[in-house]
Amino acid sequence: YQLAIVVDDARQGVTDVVRGNDLLSSAARQQAIATALGLDSPRWWHLPLVRGEDGRRLAKRHGDTRISSFRAAGVPTERVIGLLASWCGVGDQTDPQPMDAAEFAATVEISTIPTDDAVLTARNIQWLTDC
């Protein structure tokens, strides 16, 4: 798997890889493989995970938390982006504000995103769906 990822990324010219911090240990293995093969390595960004209030990674046990489900329920995109922005350190985490994609891109810097995992709370879900 690790070899395939490294070769595939190199063939596609991947320069940046953004993934969850649960895959941080893969970066060292992939770096070693790329070096051994004489390939350039991408920059890796390992972001915090989103967890449920029980501290566990989001899963079916937390209900349907897929973006597509929120979209189907009529949740405006700006609310989802606003919640993500609050987890990324924009504004008050306890009081997210709707935000469009352009504002998110202009405001959020990947290097300043908090390293602690985000927690999807019942209050967050209520805020998303109260529109």
Locate each region found by the language model.
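Non-catalytic terminal extensions that flank enzyme cores
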Residues: 56-58, 64-131
